[in-house]
């Protein structure tokens, strides 16, 4: 009887480790994709992506990363106490990949309750809900007014101090860093999982 109980507990523990856990609006799942952003100066930011929260957004981000889309791009908009934004191919905040995806957030009819807390990754967009393409931002500090209005899809697991450093760099009147904050190389580890191309608008 003791052996069967031990086996059952071990099995239950294995199942538990595969399930998403929720704590104060934070999510984690074993073997979720991990994105690594290597800055030009050698600094590293690592973030876990949440396909269970924003599946098409994650597919889109992974697709762009695998194509080398973000390599050499900059964080063109930096606001201390708020967020750092990058992913524009022309570095102005006006560019994108040539397509858009559906906004996976509550105000657009999609159940996504990931909060915009420190370190969370989310998709930038225009006033139109389905206008996100490649631009994303990383939260420097909590911004609850964004909750439900933007497609949050991941969170920094290593290098939040680098995010903080970028967020406090000197900027001009348009929130553009005076010294370019360049993403030298962006890679992703999907741990053997194949992610399809995203659905596009």
Residue positions per predicted region:
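Cyclophilin-like peptidyl-prolyl cis-trans isomerases
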Residues: 14, 20-201
């Amino acid at each position: 009887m003791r052996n069967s109980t031990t086996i059952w507990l071990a099995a239950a523990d294995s199942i538990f480790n595969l399930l998403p856990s929720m704590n104060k609006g934070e999510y984690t799942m074993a073997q979720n994709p991990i994105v690594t952003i290597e800055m030009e100066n050698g600094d590293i930011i690592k973030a876990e992506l949440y396909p269970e929260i924003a599946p098409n957004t994650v597919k889109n981000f992974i697709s762009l990363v695998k194509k080398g889309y973000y390599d050499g791009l900059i964080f063109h908009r930096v606001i201390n106490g708020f967020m750092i934004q990058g992913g524009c191919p022309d570095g102005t905040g006006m560019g994108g990949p040539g397509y858009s995806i559906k906004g996976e957030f509550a105000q657009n009819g999609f159940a996504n309750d990931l909060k915009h807390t420190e370190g969370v990754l989310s998709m930038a967009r225009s006033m139109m809900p389905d206008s996100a393409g490649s631009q994303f931002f990383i939260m420097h500090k909590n911004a609850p007014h964004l909750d439900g209005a933007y497609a949050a899809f991941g969170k920094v697991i290593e290098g939040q101090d680098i995010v903080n450093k970028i967020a406090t760099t000197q900027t001009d009147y348009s929130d553009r860093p005076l010294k370019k904050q360049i993403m030298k190389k962006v890679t992703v580890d999907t741990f053997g999982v194949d992610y399809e191309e995203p659905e596009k608008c």
